[in-house]
Amino acid sequence: MKTVAALLVVLSAVIFPAVTRADTSDRFAMGGWIEKFQPAIDQANASGELFRIRGHCQSNCTLFLGVRNVCVERGATLLFHAGHGRGPNRHVINAGSTQRMLNAYNARLRRYVTANGYLAKLEFSSISGARIIDEFGYKECPRGG
């Protein structure tokens, strides 16, 4: 019986690799500096495996919207704000960091966050995962991952 169970696990990993091996935004939920995010973004793009945005995803976590095989869970909440400097410049908007975030978003989302000033201020503005899927055309994550 244990052999059958082990075989089923292996087969499901082969048949459903995107679901069983999907990386998630969980460990990046609270944002942070680009050095923390870029290796994970590069890895996700290189592997082509599904990258799942779920739960709370703020600041640079939204960069994962630019991953080539990204999906978003309907229950996710994405929080957007302008990029900013470090140290004494932490409260100063940084055009380069802001542009990096904009470049990660598809055209519809980019137009929306720009038109509504989401990346022109340091305070968070949120968009639900359901809205990211329905209005901005991002892929919905398969259930069960």
Where are these regions (language model features)?
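Bacterial N-terminal signal peptides
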Residues: 6-14
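Short, Lys/Arg-enriched charge-dense amphipathic segments
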Residues: 13, 74-84, 133-145
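Sec/Tat signal peptide C-region and signal peptidase I cleavage site
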Residues: 15-22
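Cleft-lining beta-strand/loop regions that shape enzyme active-site pockets
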Residues: 23-76, 80-86
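Charged, glycine-interspersed solvent-exposed loop segments at helix/strand-loop junctions
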Residues: 25-27, 35-52, 89-145
